[in-house]
Amino acid sequence: MAGQPAATGSPSADKDGMEPNVVARISQWADDHLRLVRNISTGMAIAGIMLLLRSIRLTSKFTSSSDIPVEFIRRNVKLRGRLRRITENGLEIEHIPITLPIIASLRKEPRGALLVKLAGVELAETGKAWLQKELKPSQLLWFQLLGKENSALFCYLLVSKGGYFSVNLNEEILRRGLGKTVLVKGLKYDSKIYWTVHRNLLKAELTALKKGEGIWKEDSEKESYLEKFKDSWREIWKKDSFLKTTGSDFSLKKESYYEKLKRTYEIWKDNMNNCSLILKFRELISRINFRRKG
């Protein structure tokens, strides 16, 4: 009796045989359409980057203070802009967002400018004249968000002076005796940079006071400064160990008080790095961190 014919192969063997064929066909198709595959990959990468940038608002153009996320101000993000004009109320700056050629060609950017004020600085008339001379129309600059009040933004202004270096206009004005320090409006007491900002502004002002620059040429101005310092900054200096060691000895005598301030500021180092390359990197890191926690 003849036996039944042997099976030609098991189902698992057929399946294993088909898998290499499918992979080979896909690989062959990809080789035959290499340009199409590259274009698809590039398109997907660009789409992903565009979605990421839009989600953290890197490509958004801000035309008013209400457009800026509260988180940006809380994190003191640095933005780039172009000066339009200087008015009695402050500087009108057109925000320049990060743009991609594809996005820029497809959409129309909104028109408008931000009202920016020098944080912690009360400009003298000579200071306003100096700003008009120093800043040119359409000049590019960076502004670091420190606080907001109504439609005005209180910022650090940084202007490139060639190469990778920038000048902090807030501190430069005080250093030249072209204005006086005031509390930065909108900057929270619990902010990490609250004390650093005010300390640097005071240090710049004391430099002008010591050299008798600008408004500090007259002794009467120096005396009024000391009175103002006592009334307006006592709360800030309570946070410093200097006052803790001196206790109630808060003398406003010109020589002794100035020497105490001088010794105190010699301890501190200027932590503000005005390298524009570093500012660009810090802005990107700030926004990436904002995206991660959002």
Swiss-Prot record:
Q: In which tissues is it expressed?
A: Highly expressed in ileocecal tissue and endometrium.
Entry-linked PANTHER family: PROTEIN C3ORF33
Keywords linked to the UniProt accession: Acetylation, Membrane, Secreted, Transmembrane, Transmembrane helix
Tell me the residues on which N-acetylalanine occurs. A2
The record's section on SUPFAM superfamilies has:
Staphylococcal nuclease (SSF50199)
Chain ranges passing through the membrane: 40-56
Q: What is the lineage of its organism?
A: Eukaryota, Metazoa, Chordata, Craniata, Vertebrata
Top-level taxon of origin: Eukaryota
- Give GO cellular component annotations, separated by semicolons: extracellular space; membrane; mitochondrion
- Identification of the protein by name: Protein C3orf33
* One example of a Gene Ontology biological process annotation: regulation of DNA-binding transcription factor activity
Gene3D superfamilies the record matches: 2.40.50.90
Question: Source species, please?
Answer: Homo sapiens
